[in-house]
Structure formats: C-alpha cells, structure tokens
C-alpha cells in the first residue's frame, strides 16, 4: 500500500463506507492513517467518548476536515461515563472549521451556554436537536442570530423551547429551507405562522404535536364539515417553494393555524397528513387546485364527529369522495398513495368517508406506482380487479383489508408492472390465493406478515425474495406506527 499513488489510495478510501473498516485500514500504515484522517468527513460519537478537552482537541486534529458531527447519547446511563458538556461542544465548534452539519441527541448536559458557542460557527448549515432537555428559546435565538448560513433546523422533544422570537428572527432575516418541529410541547402549531416571510424560502416543513393516535380525540367536539378555511385570506404569507409538507397530531379548530398552509403550496410534491383534526374536503380541494405537481400523498385518518346541520351529526374520517375527485382531476402526476384508517370497524364501512368508487376514480386517473392501504374497509375483490389494470402499479401493500380474498389475489397477480406485494393481517387470503401469485411469475418481492391462513411453504413458492412472519408485532412495527 505504501507504494501506491496517493490519488489511487484516496479513491480506494472513498469506496469504503463502514466506519469499522476505515478504522482498521488506518492502522495498516502511517500513510493510510494520515490520508484516512484527512478524508473522513463525518463521525458519530456518544457513550464511551472521552470528554476531556485535550482528548476532544486530539480527535478534531485527527479528522481536520470534519463537516458532519453527530453526538448521540440515546440509552445512556451514568455508569457509561460523562456526557459531552458545554465546554466539550465549544471544542468541536471551535476546532472543526468545516463543520456544516451537527446533530445533538439526548445530550442532557448541553444547555443554552453550549448553543451560544455554536453562534460563532459561521459555516453551520444544518442543526438537529433531539431530546435536549436543558435547551431553551434563549439558546436557540443565539443560534438564529449567529449562524447566518443555517438552512435546516430540526427540533425534536425539546420541552423547554417555547417563545418563538427565534422563529420570527429566522423568518425575517434567516435562510431556512427545512424546518422540522416534533413533540415540542411549548410550540403550538399556530405559532409557526409567525415565521412570516420565511415561508417563501421553506422547501420542507414538518410539525408533529404531542398526542398519539387517540391523543386528540374529544368525543363531545363536533366539527363543521362545510367550513372553508381558504375562502378568505386569513393569513398573509406565501409558501410557493414548499415541496414537502407533513402535519401530524394537531387540532385545527377553533384556531385555523397550519391548516391555512394547505391552500398556499404551489410547488408541493409530497404531502403527509397524519391524524390532523377538523380538516374537511375543502382543505384537500383547495390544495389540489394549487398543487398540480403533487406526486405523493399520505392520509392517516381516525374517527371524528362532523356536522353541516345542527340536526344531524356523523362519526367518520375527515374526507369524502369529493376530495378524491378533486385530486383525480387536478393532481395528474400522483404516483404514491398511502391511506390508513384507525379505529374504523369493518362492519361499519360508512365510518370511512371514502368509497371504493371514489378511490378507483383516483387510481385510474393518475400514474400510481406505490399504493398502501391500511384498514381500508371499502376495498374488496372488485377493487383488486380494477387495480389489476393499473399500467404503472409496481408496489402494493395491504394491511387488515378484510374484504380481500383469494379471488382478489387471482386478479392482482396479472397487474402488468407489479413487482412487490406486502400482505399484513389479511386473514381472508389463503395458500390458494398465494399460489395464484406464483403462477403469474411476476413478483420479485413478497412480504407476508401474520396472515393466519398463509403458510411459509406457500409463500416460498412465489418468488426468491420472501419475508414471512407470524409475529403480530412485526406487522405493526414495520408499518410506521412508531411515528404516530
């Protein structure tokens, strides 16, 4: 290795991605040790890191071109040793001259003083704070003022951050393109509207409240299904650069709040609405009219009470077929659809606002490549028959779709481009239906999770890439419920 040209060695090092392999290789020779150290751009440290100032300075000298640092103390207990504190963070910020991306996770000994050190890090572009219990709005404001290049900010489970002066400053003088706020109980969704002109630059935005799937349920609250939050320009801001929007676990009544964003996104490509309360058809209709570029939509819906007439009230999910018709008419680039329904009983199909007719209008109007249906009680074998003629469908995931049987499997087996199929808790599908998939010889990947009437032997006969499990926890853990 000593005789190889440095340029060739550098290329070899670039192709090695595992940190353990890089560490081993650096011990082979002094040349490799130096070159690997100079080339390493990212490190992830946590429990076991020596927090002495001298050791941290030595680490920074070993890797002089670090641009990405992740400090993660998840699972930390006192016997693991000391955590990095404000003084240690100052060493990183002052000795890593190329630092642009910093993540602090479960750092219990870093507070506002530590964040003030980052204010001198003029190259910082991305900052992620996860479970930072001692950081408040004061420290965040110092970062907003000092880090003039900051374009991405993630705040997750930061319970002491409340005042939004930092947000107002970033909206007025900052350059944020990505903002993610989750589980920060001091920040309400309507506070985010104080971002003002900053919405113009934002390309990705996520806000998730503190409630779980049922955390916002209020059985005595009835929402107006005819209310139109977009008929008047209540908030004077634009978000024409926004491409990725996620709203989860928030109640948009009586405060309209972030609901207003839905009618202002002209460049939106990806939308995720997960257990947002009080929305109705008018919200998706307004969005569809301005978002002709929409390519992916995820709607996770639970039961709510709606009424447009004081004499009548119904319990159902937020949207009806009118929303599907609007999407079908205006969003002709839609490729990914994820529909999940929570708390809806199979013997009460009216609890879901969508019908199979409306759903198929959407599917047949757009080039859908990926389709996920969870507890879609309106969907049956006739729906599978219609789906089988979808010319672009490549990936299909069905979970707890009780009306889908072996007949549906026979239909879907002949879908022109279908290469990946996932069945979870679909108890009306048996070995007979799975055999139909094997006869078609089209699938490249098959996942069977907790389908009680499907055997491992039948699944293995379909294709080479098969995942099979009878463990019910596997079925739930792999469908994203951890994000609820």
Task: Describe every region a protein language model picked out.
Residues 212, 273-276, 289-428:
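Eukaryotic tandem repeat interaction scaffolds
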Residues 63, 77, 96, 110-111, 121-122, 135-136, 146-147, 161, ...:
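Leucine-rich repeat
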Residues 1-225, 231-249, 259-262, 270, ...:
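N-terminal adaptor-interaction module of cullin-RING ubiquitin ligase components
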Residues 416, 421-428, 432-484:
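C-terminal interaction modules of eukaryotic adaptor/scaffold proteins
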Residues 89-90, 253, 360:
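Right-handed parallel beta-helix
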Residues 1-3, 211, 303, 343, ...:
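CRL adaptor-proximal regions
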């Amino acid at each position: 290795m000593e005789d190889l040209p440095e340029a060739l060695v550098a290329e070899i090092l670039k192709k090695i991605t595992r940190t353990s392999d890089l560490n081993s290789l650096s011990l082979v020779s002094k040349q490799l040790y130096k070159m690997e150290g100079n080339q390493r751009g990212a490190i992830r440290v946590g429990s076991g890191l020596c927090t002495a100032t001298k050791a941290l300075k030595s680490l920074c000298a070993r890797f002089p071109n670090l641009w990405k640092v992740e400090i993660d103390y998840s699972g930390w207990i006192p016997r693991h040793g000391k955590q990095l504190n404000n003084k240690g963070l100052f060493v990183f910020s002052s000795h890593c001259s190329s630092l642009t991306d910093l993540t602090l996770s479960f750092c219990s000994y870093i507070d506002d003083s530590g964040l003030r050190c980052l204010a001198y890090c003029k190259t910082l572009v991305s900052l992620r704070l996860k479970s930072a219990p001692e950081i408040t709005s004061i420290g965040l404001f110092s970062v907003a003022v000092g880090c003039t290049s900051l374009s991405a900010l993630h705040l997750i489970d930061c319970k002491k951050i409340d005042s939004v002066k930092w947000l107002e400053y970033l909206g007025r003088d900052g350059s944020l393109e990505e903002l993610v706020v989750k589980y920060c109980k001091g920040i309400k969704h309507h506070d985010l509207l104080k971002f003002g002109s900053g919405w113009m630059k934002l390309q990705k935005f996520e806000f998730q409240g503190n409630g779980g799937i049922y955390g916002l349920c209020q059985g005595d609250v009835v929402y107006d299904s005819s209310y139109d939050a977009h008929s008047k320009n209540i908030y004077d801001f634009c978000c024409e650069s926004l491409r990725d929007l996620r709203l989860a676990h928030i109640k948009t009544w009586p405060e309209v709040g972030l609901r207003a964003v839905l009618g202002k996104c002209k460049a939106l490509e990806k939308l995720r609405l997960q257990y947002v309360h009080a929305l109705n058809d008018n919200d998706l209709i307004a969005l569809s009219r301005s978002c002709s570029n929409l390519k992916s939509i995820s709607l996770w819906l639970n039961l709510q009470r709606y009424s447009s007439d004081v004499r009548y009230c119904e319990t159902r999910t937020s949207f009806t077929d009118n929303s599907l018709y609007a999407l079908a008419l205006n969003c002709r680039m839609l490729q990914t659809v994820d529909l999940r329904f929570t708390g809806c009983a199979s013997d009460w199909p009216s609890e879901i606002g969508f019908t199979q007719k409306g759903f198929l209008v959407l599917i047949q109007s757009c080039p859908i490549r990926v389709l996920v249906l969870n507890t879609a009680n309106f969907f049956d074998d006739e729906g599978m028959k219609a789906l089988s003629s979808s010319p672009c469908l490549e990936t299909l995931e069905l979970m707890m779709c009780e009306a889908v049987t072996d007949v549906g499997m026979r239909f879907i087996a002949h879908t022109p481009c279908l290469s990946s199929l996932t069945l979870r808790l679909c108890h009306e599908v048996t070995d007979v239906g799975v055999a139909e998939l094997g006869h078609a010889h089209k699938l490249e990947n098959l996942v069977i999770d907790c389908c009680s009437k499907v055997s491992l032997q039948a699944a293995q006969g379909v294709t080479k890439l098969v995942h099979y499990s009878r463990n019910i926890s596997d079925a739930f853990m792999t469908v994203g419920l951890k994000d609820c």
